Amino acid sequence: MYKASKRSKENLKGVDSRLVLLVGYALAISKVDFVVVEGLRSTERQKKLYREKKSKCDGVTNISKHQEGKAIDVYYVGWKNTDSSKDDRWRKLISTFKFTGKKLNLKLEFGYDWGWDNPHIELK
């Protein structure tokens, strides 16, 4: 059983309480340790990510779920930028979140299912 790190707790501030609950339950049952690397996002940060082509939302006319506190980004502990997006740890981690979301009766959308944003989890 894993517990939320200081970094995860900090990054969950301002995030919808349902996502906080989701993270807590997922950590308790996950076979893969993970960290929440981003939650609530400022307009300035969103604009920066858009300019860097790291987001499709410009932060002004197209608001990100992160700006509403309705999305988180998670990485498994030990993740490296050189790891394959097909790494089995992603599948295990996302499966844990899907299972937990179902148990909590949450409607979630996963960047993993889009095929290009593995860390992203948002409330529908």
Segments predicted by a language model, with ranges:
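Extended, low-complexity, intrinsically disordered C-terminal regulatory tails
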Residues: 25-56, 103, 107
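Soluble non-cytosolic domains of exported or imported proteins
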Residues: 9-17, 40, 84-91
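Active-site acidic/histidine clusters and adjacent loop/turn architecture
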Residues: 1-35
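Short amphipathic alpha-helical surface micro-motifs
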Residues: 16-19, 53-58
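Catalytic cores and adjacent binding grooves of peptidoglycan-active enzymes
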Residues: 56-124
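Short linear motifs at secondary-structure transitions and domain/linker junctions
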Residues: 9-13, 44-53, 96-98
